[in-house]
A protein has these predicted regions:
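Generic structural signal for well-ordered, non-membrane alpha-helical segments
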Residues: 1, 5, 13, 49, ...
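Active-site-proximal alpha-helical scaffold in enzymes
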Residues: 1-22, 59-64, 172-193
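A generic, well-ordered mixed alpha/beta core segment in the N-terminal half of proteins
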Residues: 1-50
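Acidic, glycine-rich active-site loops and adjacent beta-strand->loop/helix elements
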Residues: 24-33, 82-83, 201-206
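Condensing-enzyme catalytic core mediating Claisen C-C bond formation in acyl metabolism
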Residues: 38-109, 113-116, 146-166, 191, ...
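Long, repeat-rich segments with strong aromatic
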Residues: 102, 108-140
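Short glycine/threonine-rich loop-to-helix capping motif typified by GTGT followed
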Residues: 129-144, 209-217
Length: 221
């Protein structure tokens, strides 16, 4: 979600295109089969796991002079592209811990690059760290003197109801950030409840082979 939105924005801002659609999706059963265990295996899920969201989101990014822009209610004012951060996490059932360091690094770098403070944002929203990843993120940023407090939300914690849906640490997957952006974040920007949001989709760079070989899982945001 974040990569497609970033590339679409760069393409439009650079004049290579006037209108670009950024689309992404994920599927629970496909992710389980590919990166964990087939559903038929009925393996027990540790409490640190997240539940891959079955969902999709699409967004149209258009140049100011394009007809689509007349329907726009918000804009992408800037992008901070994160870097790969590897803390040596090897457990594919603990993705929040693998991605949180990358999220912390990108937030810190974004604030440095823009000269802003966390208080300049109505919300800072990460993609799919889950409840455990959120705790790690806040601890890492606190060590740098950055206190998120109640400004931080995570799509993985928003998309499911922890009281009625047992998804353990929360939701995950490309569709998690995309559907939350489309159904939760953008409507609040359109209604004027929020003026500025730092949206930070998170990702893990693993394959179905690498983690089975005991390799670490780098994260990016």
């Amino acid at each position: 979600c974040g990569e497609s939105l970033g590339l679409a924005s760069i393409t439009v801002a650079g004049g290579a295109a006037d209108c670009v659609m950024a689309l992404t999706s994920s599927h629970f059963a496909s992710a389980e089969k590919e990166f964990r265990f087939p559903l038929e295996y009925a393996g027990q899920r540790p409490l640190s796991t997240t539940w891959t969201v079955t969902g999709s989101g699409a967004f149209v990014i258009a140049a100011e002079e394009h007809p689509c822009s007349t329907q726009a209610h918000c804009c992408i004012s800037g992008i901070t592209t994160g870097k790969v951060v590897d803390y040596g996490i090897k457990d594919s059932m603990h993705m929040g811990a693998a991605m949180a360091p990358a999220a912390a690094d990108t937030i810190r770098q974004h604030l440095i690059d823009t000269g802003r403070d966390v208080s300049d944002y109505d919300r800072i929203i990460t993609g799919d760290l889950g409840s455990i990843g959120q705790t790690i993120l806040k601890d890492l940023l606190s060590d740098c003197g950055i206190l998120l407090g109640d400004l931080h939300e995570d799509c993985g914690m928003l998309i499911f109801d922890p009281d009625t849906q047992d998804t353990h640490a929360g939701g995950s997957g490309c569709g998690c950030a995309a559907t939350t952006l489309a159904a939760y974040i953008l409507p609040r920007l359109i209604r004027g409840e929020w003026k500025r949001v730092l949206f930070l989709p998170t990702g893990a760079l693993l394959s179905k082979v690498s983690f089975n070989e005991g390799q670490s899982i780098p994260g990016i945001a």
